[in-house]
């Protein structure tokens, strides 16, 4: 009876009706899976979801470069906050370590997170791969949660984390002629060899988007909580003066090394001639401007192998 009552309550929160029965079935199937594994606030589901293996890929951890963040968006917009809130646990438990890591590696304060986290403050995979965005990417889920609910109790819980992320970027952004640039942060995973080939990455399109949203919302949240009044002007100033999203044409990046090392086919062979000169957004302003492998960092692979 308790089992039935739990599911009845869960399904009564929201519903959808679609013209396509296959997509509708997949929607409810994904909800069923996430509701089954995302119940313990201290132990959110890892990258493998419902799957188990003796030697799990990616160490079976919380991969916080989009894999961990993305599934919870669908829970939040459908009102299932009890299942979406476990997302936050790995971030909140690692704040002390990540602050120390930032001081040692970047020589300033703030929250600087590695790629693979475990529960209870465990670093499962101490890889950085030339990325600085994982912490702010996770912060966006928290901001969306507050934006949907305006739950000040929740905001109080996550605010120390959000403030730590703000501290990181206030100190790490490079201001040139009044414009804030992201330096040393790849759009996605970057090897040392890739950095040697393409240079230190700057102004990744995804991180610029994260920063715009983050620093636009931080003054609102701090005002709701009556905290950090003196910081709000600075946060808005950053949001309004970020570097523009990198863009150009396909023809202009035909010689970009990242185009040719991943696949044998040339990008120009996949597109009609008239599209080669249309303006597009690049992955990074400096560095790997295009990738067959990780286009725009919008794909995600959760649950891997399921």
Show where each model-derived region lies.
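Acidic/polar, glycine-enriched structural segments that form the non-catalytic walls/loops
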Residues: 1-61, 81-85, 92-100, 286
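Active-site core of glycosidic bond-cleaving carbohydrate-active enzymes
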Residues: 61-100, 104, 117-123, 127-160, ...
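Glycine- and aromatic-rich loop/turn segments at beta-sheet edges
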Residues: 41-56, 101-105, 113, 173-187, ...
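Acidic/His metal-coordination segments adjacent to aromatic residues that form catalytic metal sites
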Residues: 48-59, 112-129, 183-204, 279, ...
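Extended, hydrophobic/aromatic-rich amphipathic alpha-helical segments that build helical scaffolds
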Residues: 24-36, 135-144, 160, 164-169
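Acidic/histidine-rich catalytic neighborhood
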Residues: 164, 168-224
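Secondary-structure transition/capping motifs at alpha-helix termini
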Residues: 36-41, 78, 82, 145-156, ...
């Amino acid at each position: 009876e308790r089992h039935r009552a739990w599911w009845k309550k869960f399904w009564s929160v929201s519903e959808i009706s679609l013209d396509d029965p296959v997509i509708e079935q997949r929607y409810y199937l994904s909800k069923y899976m996430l509701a089954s594994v995302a119940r313990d606030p201290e132990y959110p589901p890892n990258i493998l979801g419902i799957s188990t293996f003796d030697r799990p890929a990616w160490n079976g951890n919380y991969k916080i470069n989009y894999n961990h963040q993305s599934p919870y968006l669908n829970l939040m917009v459908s009102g299932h906050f009890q299942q979406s809130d476990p997302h936050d646990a790995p971030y909140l438990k690692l704040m002390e370590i990540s602050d120390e890591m930032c001081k040692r590696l970047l020589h300033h304060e703030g929250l600087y997170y590695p790629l693979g986290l475990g529960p209870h403050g465990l670093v499962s995979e101490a890889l950085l791969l030339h990325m600085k965005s994982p912490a702010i990417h996770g912060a966006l889920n928290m901001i969306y949660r507050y934006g949907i609910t305006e739950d000040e109790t929740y905001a109080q819980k996550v605010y120390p984390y959000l403030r730590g992320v703000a501290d990181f970027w206030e100190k790490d952004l490079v201001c040139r002629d009044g414009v804030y640039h992201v330096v040393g942060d790849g759009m996605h995973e970057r090897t040392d060899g890739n950095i040697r080939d393409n240079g230190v990455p700057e102004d990744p399109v995804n991180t610029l988007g994260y920063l715009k949203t983050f620093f636009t919302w931080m003054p609102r949240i701090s005002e709701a909580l009556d905290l950090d009044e003196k910081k709000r002007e600075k946060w808005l100033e950053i949001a309004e003066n970020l570097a523009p999203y990198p863009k150009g044409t396909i023809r202009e990046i035909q010689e970009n090394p990242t185009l040719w090392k991943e696949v044998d086919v040339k990008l120009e062979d996949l597109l009609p001639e008239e599209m080669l000169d249309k303006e597009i957004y690049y992955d990074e302003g400096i560095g790997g401007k295009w990738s067959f492998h990780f286009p725009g960092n919008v794909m995600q692979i959760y649950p891997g192998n399921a």
